[in-house]
């Protein structure tokens, strides 16, 4: 055992060098030391020669000194998995951070696992109904698929994720795992309390100090944590989700935000002595992303459906970080600042968002044709906007005037009040059934609702509500 102990030789920020005597820990092994009375975990990243390894620290390195003893655990970071994690908050190394005592785990599992083999994967296509009109109609999510939510700062990615957790937990009742990767601690705290309020999780204070009966496990590595924690916390969350999947569950895995995973990797990359690639990102960007994304998949045992918020630096979709994640996704939901500026929420761009599920073979002809007609109408309106800006509406043909009027109604009907946003908007949230969504938009593009004013379609659920609102507006005007 004695030869498994090394000593710290150098500390540079989050990167720590440890020298061993003869024994050399494997790459990705977890090493442990105590820093001012707290357990500190280091993960081996490189072998430097002369029995020295370079490691990434999973917590703050202030207080570490040269010569401090470090022990090799002989395995990657191990985290608790199973039903005991539900309703609890843990950090990257599996320690509880919610002050409710230790997590009673069925087992522990290493955070680095191989991706399921080709033979283990399942490939059937089925859509996951979210109750959000714009998503279900134009870019539907695949059950067991990967979904990316793209958007700049402040266009509503986190609110959309919270609404999805809320809707799917209510409609589908399965387990969820939420990985908070490098996002705001306040939002993490809000999410925990909102989950208790919406009965997704149980309040331990009213449940005899236990979170039993909860539906969602939370794994946090927030903005204030060192890059090591932010670069690994997504893997910790995924490990918890994989365990539920292997037990035959359909799991929802939420990551907010996958960009911070890449960002953390780029922060430690330079300290590890790697030559940066485009825009200063790590040269291993695609490999890191692939190692995470290939594990998020549906097997013959169960499924993982993942929804990942992806921050787009400076609203530039060609930035290497968002671009690296595009290749892995089944559906992309792009949030647009220009739509948010019109006050239309969720600010999903109906022409930029895509899904491989948008096919008549999967959705049926009625849904597919309605979605395509909606996109055609919006695309025509977009093409006419330059003419309208220069010459005004009067110069358009009668046909184009009708198209513009319908497109403006469609734009407004794509908005919807959310349950989790009730506190901001004051209007109760709406969950819209898929057949109501299709019927409503089909009527709109066919001109059945041309008589209603466009305000009637703003922030309503189903078409019945829009008709009701139209009557109310007409009565007020009279």
Swiss-Prot record:
It is found in: Cell inner membrane. It catalyses: ATP + H2O + 4 H(+)(in) = ADP + phosphate + 5 H(+)(out). This is ATP synthase subunit beta. Belongs to the ATPase alpha/beta chains family. It comes from Xanthobacter autotrophicus (strain ATCC BAA-1158 / Py2). Keywords: ATP synthesis, ATP-binding, Cell inner membrane, Cell membrane, CF(1), Hydrogen ion transport, Ion transport, Membrane, Nucleotide-binding, Translocase, Transport. PANTHER family: ATP SYNTHASE, ATP SYNTHASE SUBUNIT BETA, MITOCHONDRIAL. One of its GO terms (cellular component) is plasma membrane. Gene3D superfamilies: 2.40.10.170, Bovine Mitochondrial F1-atpase, Atp Synthase Beta Chain, Chain D, domain 3 (1.10.1140.10), P-loop containing nucleotide triphosphate hydrolases (3.40.50.300). It is a peripheral membrane protein. The gene is atpD.
């Amino acid at each position: 055992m004695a030869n498994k102990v090394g000593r710290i030789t150098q500390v540079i920020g989050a990167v720590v060098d440890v020298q061993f005597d003869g024994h050399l820990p494997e790459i990705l092994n977890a090493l442990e030391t105590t820093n001012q009375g707290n357990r500190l975990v280091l993960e081996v990243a490189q072998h430097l020669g002369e029995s020295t390894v370079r490691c990434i620290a999973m917590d703050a390195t202030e207080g570490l000194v040269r010569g401090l003893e470090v022990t090799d655990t002989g395995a990657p970071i191990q985290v608790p998995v199973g039903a005991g994690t539900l309703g609890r908050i843990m950090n990257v190394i599996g320690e509880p951070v919610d002050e409710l005592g230790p997590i009673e785990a069925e087992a522990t599992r290493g955070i680095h696992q191989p991706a399921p083999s080709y033979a283990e994967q399942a490939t059937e296509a089925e859509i996951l109904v979210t109750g959000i009109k714009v998503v279900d109609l134009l870019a539907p999510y695949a059950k067991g698929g990967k979904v990316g939510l793209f958007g700049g700062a402040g266009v509503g990615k986190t609110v959309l994720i919270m609404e999805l957790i809320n809707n799917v937990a209510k409609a589908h009742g399965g387990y969820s795992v939420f990985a908070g990767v490098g996002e705001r601690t306040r939002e993490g705290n809000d999410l925990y309390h909102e989950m208790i309020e919406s009965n997704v999780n149980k309040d331990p204070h009213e449940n005899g100090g236990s979170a039993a009966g909860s539906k969602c496990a939370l794994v946090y590595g927030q903005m204030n944590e060192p890059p090591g924690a932010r670069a690994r916390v997504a893997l910790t969350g995924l490990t918890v989700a994989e365990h539920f999947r292997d037990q035959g569950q359909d799991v929802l895995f939420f990551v907010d935000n996958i960009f911070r995973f890449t960002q953390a990797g780029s922060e430690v990359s330079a300290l590890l002595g790697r030559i940066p690639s485009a825009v200063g990102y790590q040269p291993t960007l695609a490999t890191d992303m692939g190692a995470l994304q290939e594990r998020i998949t549906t097997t013959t045992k169960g499924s993982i459906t993942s929804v990942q918020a992806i921050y787009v630096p400076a609203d530039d979709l060609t930035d290497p970080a968002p671009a690296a994640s595009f290749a892995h996704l089944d559906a992309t939901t792009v949030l647009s600042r220009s739509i948010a500026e019109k006050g239309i929420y969720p600010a999903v761009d109906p022409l930029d968002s895509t899904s491989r599920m948008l096919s008549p073979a999967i959705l049926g002809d009625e849904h597919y044709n309605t979605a395509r007609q909606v996109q055609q109408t919006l695309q025509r309106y977009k093409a006419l906007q330059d003419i309208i800006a220069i010459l005004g509406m009067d110069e358009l043909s009668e046909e184009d005037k009708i198209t513009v009027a319908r497109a403006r109604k469609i734009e407004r009907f794509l908005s919807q009040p959310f349950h989790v946003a009730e506190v901001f908007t004051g209007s109760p949230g709406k969950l819209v059934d898929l057949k109501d969504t299709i019927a409503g938009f089909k009527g709109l593009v066919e001109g059945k609702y041309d008589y209603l004013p466009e305000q009637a379609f703003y922030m309503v659920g189903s078409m019945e509500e829009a008709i009701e609102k139209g009557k109310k507006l007409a009565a007020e005007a009279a």
